[in-house]
From Swiss-Prot:
The modification Arginine amide is found at residue 62. Hemolymph. Belongs to the cecropin family. It is found in: Secreted. It comes from Glossina morsitans morsitans. This is Cecropin. One of its GO terms (cellular component) is extracellular region. Monomer.
Length: 63
């Protein structure tokens, strides 16, 4: 029973120390994912602008 308490205590301390050290690593991955999302959004907006301009040109040509 005493061994179980010591094991849980050591596991808890180890989990806390590992989670604090990996926070930077997870933050970097989160920022990369956020950057991909921003690039996708920007590309979609530009694509919609080009499509709208093409539709305007087609409407102008048709009269």
């Amino acid at each position: 029973m005493n061994f179980y308490k010591i094991f849980v205590f050591i596991a808890l301390i180890l989990a806390l120390s590992v989670s604090q050290s990996e926070a930077g690593w997870l933050k970097k991955i989160g920022k990369k994912i956020e950057r991909v999302g921003q690039n996708t959004r920007d590309a979609t907006v530009k694509g919609l602008e080009v499509a709208q301009q093409a539709a305007n040109v087609a409407a102008t040509v048709r009269g």
